UniProtKB/Swiss-Prot annotation:
This is 7-cyano-7-deazaguanine synthase. The keyword Oxidoreductase does not apply. It comes from Neisseria gonorrhoeae (strain ATCC 700825 / FA 1090). InterPro entries: QueC, Rossmann-like_a/b/a_fold. The keyword Disulfide bond does not apply.
Length: 224
């Protein structure tokens, strides 16, 4: 795919960094760009990690400001005074966790598509996952497929949205990183914690999923 270009929606977290590295290996570093969104998230470490990783991997990164979202929606990821539901993983079936940002992935895909078309890019890659999605409706395959159709119709352009992690568990995502030879890089350089704690708080839903998946992956490696 060396003659094709790809745009990765990139946050600096485990999933999007795994997708970025996979895209580099698939399309070639010179054909991959990253797009990151400043949407009013409650901590800066996520953006700092994304910038550092993009530079370290030698990938062009564009940062777009969507902080106006603070004016129209309320959630724990954007409100420093809100408590993050640590039991969100277990309670997701009974309601959407308070860390869900209404419209976030829809906006990310929309702005990514606008940017991609201007760059002559058709392939858009997102690290969303339906298997360990913490109850977020915009991480489901049906949503992404719907957005793909909508964007193609809206811009009369043949976008192809790829979600390589969609049906993988966190353990399988770690295993994918291991297969690409970057497990330690992902483990040491990416940021996942909802609370913005470097190294993780080990309490928020994101940290729990990450650590649980890593433990399962490492246990599987030992068993082989």
């Amino acid at each position: 795919m060396s003659n094709q270009k790809a745009l990765v929606i990139f946050s600096g977290g485990q999933d999007s960094t795994t997708c970025l590295i996979q895209a580099i290996q698939t399309y070639g570093r010179e054909n991959v760009q990253a797009i990151t969104f400043r949407y009013g998230q409650r901590h800066a470490v996520e953006l700092e990690r994304a910038e550092w990783i993009a530079q370290d991997l030698g990938v062009s990164q564009t940062v777009l400001d969507l902080s106006l979202m603070r004016q129209i929606t309320h959630n724990a990821l954007m409100d420093e005074t809100a408590a993050i539901e640590t039991a969100a993983i277990e309670t997701a079936d009974n309601g959407v966790p308070n860390t869900f940002v209404d419209g976030r992935n829809a906006l990310f895909l929309l702005y990514a598509a606008i940017f991609a078309k201007g760059q002559g890019i058709r392939h858009i890659i997102a690290g969303v996952c339906e298997t360990d999605f913490s109850g977020y409706p915009d991480c489901r395959g049906v949503f992404v497929k719907s957005m793909n159709v909508t964007l193609n119709l809206a811009m009369d352009y043949d976008f192809q949205i790829h979600t390589p992690l969609m049906y993988l568990t966190k353990a399988q995502t770690w295993a994918l990183a291991d297969e690409m030879g970057v497990l330690d890089y992902i483990r040491e350089q990416t940021h996942t914690c909802y609370k913005g704690i470097v190294g993780g708080c080990r309490e928020c839903p994101s940290c729990i999923l990450r650590e649980r998946g890593l433990a399962e992956c490492l246990e599987s490696k030992k068993a082989v």
